């Protein structure tokens, strides 16, 4: 028996987003006051991300008898990330040149007030490649979890899982315990997901109430160019990769629609991380590959952020009348490939990464970021959506490369569409 449509999670989230837009538009002060609802939901999800990554990675690695396999999976994932990220950067650059969203502004950078972007620039100046790599190593095992840093948690999990695998059968009881604890944490995720509509409502009401739909009008061409380019990237680039791997990108998007709507409402791809990992396992990807690829992808495979970065840089150059040479554009690409690795799945990280890129390329004034500050929140939804789709596709691809993908289950699950989602939602209700 099918559930009434109003009890389906993605319908509830869609309705909540719509109501949030109305509230923020007509009663902006009330909309801004709804911010704690969105923040609270994201904090609930972040509370559980660390333990879930730890349990998933540890049990996955502990189940691998060959530690070379861990390195092989990680190496293939990083290779995939670099290739696809480069495509994303190039597509963002090409689209900005082709559609010219910044031409016609004729803005003098000296007239721009940079006070609003000082917090982003100061954070960006603190980032460097060496510091980023050193930051991956936590001060203590516990600080990785208390800080909620995904890469630090992943590093701790890799060491812990490798140690359990080395000990072998004597550590079997520990592995079994972690497997059971993992089930508890995923059950908590199902409970938290029930309030996703409230979180999406609060976050969207705040966004519209604070920034207003009117702030979109002057920069509609840039927003339209970015959204159009992201759609082209997902449909054609990720679509071609998916087709080569043996699945349809549109069916895959339909399969993770609940996660996408949560991301749309909260502007944070981290909000859907636990559910995405569970969905990918149900899709036929091995637990070990999911545990390694998804968390790593949240810092190394941000396709939406990459498209945004090169497009935003060219937009600022066009708006301020700066002509960039081929060498300067290649420099921007190289710098962006490094700075994008410092971005995480949280709101605002893409803007900080853009500041880091501009700081290394003095030809383009950092003050130009003021032009897109007001609309960055509206663009962050598209960044986060593209990022999560890209990470999902990457996990399926690496699983296929490792022969760790149950293709029959993949085909069956995608063909069934929403049936598995209904079962997942029912499981969450039986608490």
Swiss-Prot record:
Q: Which InterPro entries match?
A: C4_dicarb_transport, Na-dicarboxylate_symporter, Na-dicarboxylate_symporter_CS, Na:dicarbo_symporter_sf
Transmembrane parts of this sequence: 8-28, 44-64, 78-98, 148-168, 188-208, 222-242, 307-327, 355-375
Q: Which GO terms describe its biological process?
A: L-aspartate transmembrane transport
Membrane topology type: Multi-pass membrane protein
Report the subcellular localization: Cell inner membrane
What is a single Pfam family found in this protein's UniProt entry?
SDF
Q: Which GO terms describe its cellular component?
A: plasma membrane
Q: Which HAMAP family match?
A: C4_dicarb_transport
Name of this chain's protein: C4-dicarboxylate transport protein
Q: Which organism is this protein's natural source?
A: Cupriavidus pinatubonensis (strain JMP 134 / LMG 1197) (Cupriavidus necator (strain JMP 134))
In the UniProt record, the gene name given for this protein reads: dctA
